[in-house]
Amino acid sequence: MDVKRVKQILSSSSQIDVTYQGVPVWIESCDEGRGIAQVHDITAPHETVEVDITALEEK
């Protein structure tokens, strides 16, 4: 995935399915300068991690 698409997903009112290493995640925010996004596993909303945006996949 790229930064532009992450920003589109963040501003969308629709639920868009995204995975990180095969795990469904919710994107919390993105840091365009660093190329990372803060995400959490949809089953564990209190466990936010930073991941490389290019590792995110839209399903």
UniProtKB/Swiss-Prot annotation:
Print the keywords alphabetically. Answer: Sporulation
* This protein's name: Small, acid-soluble spore protein H 1
Q: Where would you say this protein principally sits, based on its record?
A: other
Q: Summarize induction of expression.
A: Expressed only in the forespore compartment of sporulating cells.
Family designation:
Belongs to the SspH family.
Keyword Signal carried by entry: no
Q: Which domain of life is it from?
A: Bacteria
InterPro entries from the entry? SASP_SspH
- Is the keyword Amino-acid biosynthesis in the record? no
Q: Native species of this protein? A: Bacillus cytotoxicus (strain DSM 22905 / CIP 110041 / 391-98 / NVH 391-98)
**Phylogenetic lineage:** Bacteria, Bacillati, Bacillota, Bacilli, Bacillales
**Subcellular localization, per the record?**
Spore core
Q: Which GO terms describe its cellular component?
A: endospore-forming forespore
Q: Please, one GO biological process term? A: sporulation resulting in formation of a cellular spore
